[in-house]
């Protein structure tokens, strides 16, 4: 079971979120059949979306678009405040570029571009915020977005570790934010611990699992747990939703589908579920338009 734990330091000067998103990213890999670099890039963006959504309240939905200029194409994810996230990468077939330690690089395949966040509060007027991609490695891009767009100094870690067969072994992340009133010596202590922190994957694979992430962030400093919530890859597509999408097409297009294709087939980009609509479905839509 994937989860996110939200905490705040006893002094109230810092807050931290830690996430185990292994099943989330594993599900995304299975649904989209992504190759190594595509898996890591999509996985990191899914985790980034989970972090951002955890900062919201109510029925807010949050879309993250990593719009790079290189071979991965666009990465698009959508998360809500109930722990659900979905997403896809335009090119799922980008394979490996590894460092000497075996880490999969994604920056070269993302390229230059924009980090776009669309926040939908359900009012009909979504809020868009754009920052440039700093490295294309997603974590640094999210930290820059939070610092620049939300004016909150932030440290972010996102990690997707693959096994020898390039399947998701472990995935997770953290967010640490400086809150008003933080003292210089406190900031220095947190910065030092984060700089010296082992890889997220190493901590998640340890016996203490997600608790090891909290230990690495806080050290011996006291903190309060605010909440612990489940998170998951979950698409909200349905036959009815795509039926409504077809209903927005002109009658002439629906008539053409009926006569030439004897129906319609639509595959959800976010989860690869395929929905079929027969001639009767199309006839019903045409009739409703007349």
Curated annotation (Swiss-Prot):
GO terms for biological process: protein refolding. InterPro entries: Heat_shock_Hsp33 (IPR000397), Heat_shock_Hsp33_C (IPR016154), Heat_shock_Hsp33_N (IPR016153). It is found in: Cytoplasm. GO terms for molecular function: protein folding chaperone; unfolded protein binding. Disulfide bonds join 235-237, 268-271. Pfam families: HSP33 (PF01430). SUPFAM superfamilies: Hsp33 domain, HSP33 redox switch-like. One of its GO terms (cellular component) is cytoplasm. Under oxidizing conditions two disulfide bonds are formed involving the reactive cysteines. Under reducing conditions zinc is bound to the reactive cysteines and the protein is inactive. Keywords: Chaperone, Cytoplasm, Disulfide bond, Redox-active center, Stress response, Zinc. Coiled coil: none annotated. PANTHER family: 33 KDA CHAPERONIN (PTHR30111:SF1). Redox regulated molecular chaperone. Protects both thermally unfolding and oxidatively damaged proteins from irreversible aggregation. Plays an important role in the bacterial defense system toward oxidative stress. Belongs to the HSP33 family. This is 33 kDa chaperonin.
